[in-house]
Amino acid sequence: MQERIAKVLACAILGPIVMLSAVRPARAQDPSTPYPNMAPLDQYLMTDVNSEISLARSAAPSSSSEGAEVMVLGRSGYTTAAQGRNGFLCLVERSWGAATHDRDFWNATVRSPVCFNPAAARTYVPVYLMKTRLVLAGRSKIEIVQAIEAALDKKDLPALEPGAMAYMTSKQQYLSDEAKQWHPHLMFFVPGDAAKSWGADLPGSPVMAANDPEEGLTIFLVWVGNWSDGSPAPPTAH
């Protein structure tokens, strides 16, 4: 998912954050992308289920992730590999969590562990799971965007609940070739283009925003000082 906000990442690691244009609509399409097409599916899969479970749980502190449901990616999509008891859901996003025009959309190296709280698990994750099924079915980028848009319009996908948020604090994350590990952060999901109402991206504001027209929401990011294992994150400022 962090790959979906690649423009946020690029701005953050290069200097002061400027107003971004995307969570999925991150960067403009780069015709020289090294990933013009989907790689063989095996390159996106993790061969050891336990390793994927562990990586998924590393997205959040164990106080939340140990009781979370965990989903892992297989040839037909994500399936539950560990039952949960606290309503949280952890998984490792792949590159197609990005905007369809993002240069890393087919980057098979991307591994983005995310732990969603109950509200996000119920109402945000279904969009990503649908997108995954479309990818694995061989749908084109245009078809993916159209299918998601139609499902949202027809309310085949749930409306985003208030309070939906997620942890991305895994030291093992690889978010894109540009951002790589980046920085531990929290994400908050809000319907529509809501950046101004949160005071995001203003001078001195700790809140970054990425508008996502493909899914009709804004993702707000707030850096935190430690990785999920408690170790300090590198000092960075925006």
Task: Annotate each PLM feature.
Residues 1-7:
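N-terminal secretory signal peptides that target proteins for export/translocation
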Residues 10-21:
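Bacterial N-terminal signal peptides
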Residues 23-28:
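Sec/Tat signal peptide C-region and signal peptidase I cleavage site
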Residues 29-238:
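Primary mode marks residue(s) on the alpha4-beta5-alpha5 output face of response regulator receiver
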